[in-house]
Amino acid sequence: MTHPTELPLSPLSALQFYATAPYPCSYLDGRVARSQVATPSHLINSDIYTELVKAGFRRSGVFTYRPYCDGCRACVPVRVPVDAFAPNRTQRRTWKRHRALVATVAALHYDEEHYALYMRYQSARHAGGGMDRDSRDQYEQFLLQSRINSRLVEFRDLDPAENGASTLRMVSMIDILGDGLSSVYTFFDPDESHASFGTYNILWQIEQAKSLRLPYVYLGYWIRESPKMAYKANFHPLEGLVDGRWKVLDPTLADLPPVDAALARAPLPGGHSGTR
């Protein structure tokens, strides 16, 4: 992987970073959030995106961002170092329980069955949040648009009693980075509420990263105060980007008091700093 300072000035030096207007936080009730956005999106290829992810950025479609909130540092970028990862007893049971699932890796593409499962998942898990009303176009913009090396993985249960029949259980979008896999979004059968499909998906990604000789699986943001994010703290060791540096994180002891926007101004790839 080429270090950004060794890259030609263009296109890395052409990236600009902007702060959005405040908007309601989707993770913590009553909070106001802002994001720092990397632009222009067409210059963000897989190599540059790898460096941005290491600096705490994520993507939604072709929109690349990281939290830039005033007075709050609740969102901690986290990743699992796959060679050091040791599954706990519950995770081992989950892996064994779903080992018969058939995973198929494909390019990003639209499938009516995937969209139907997505809508069922949103209606059951995030009712009233807005995404439960996503149109097909919104679904495609959110999950199927990418300018980097991305894949769609579907997981199916095969029915041995029915020749060739299968049941779609889960769909996951992942990005392949220079130093790991980045979990973009996952949705699964909401009728199997205790199946731990999400946990199995991360375990599967860890195994894939190992097979590809990639050192990390990036899990996005962990928020201590958000119950929906609690599962990420169950993967040990877990590294977090705190004060601009990756370090092993102990979620029970993490000292993450609210601060001003200085954290969001942590060094950017290529020596950029600040926001326009």
Curated annotation (Swiss-Prot):
Return the Pfam families for the record. ATE_C, ATE_N
Indicate the transmembrane segments per the record. none
Cross-referenced NCBIfam families: PRK01305.1-1, PRK01305.1-3, PRK01305.2-3
* Gene name per UniProt: bpt
Q: What is this protein called?
A: Aspartate/glutamate leucyltransferase
What species does this protein belong to? Burkholderia pseudomallei (strain K96243)
Which GO cellular component does the record give, naming just one?
A: cytoplasm
> According to its UniProt entry, what is the function of this protein?
Functions in the N-end rule pathway of protein degradation where it conjugates Leu from its aminoacyl-tRNA to the N-termini of proteins containing an N-terminal aspartate or glutamate.
Q: Which keywords accompany this UniProt record?
A: Acyltransferase, Cytoplasm, Transferase
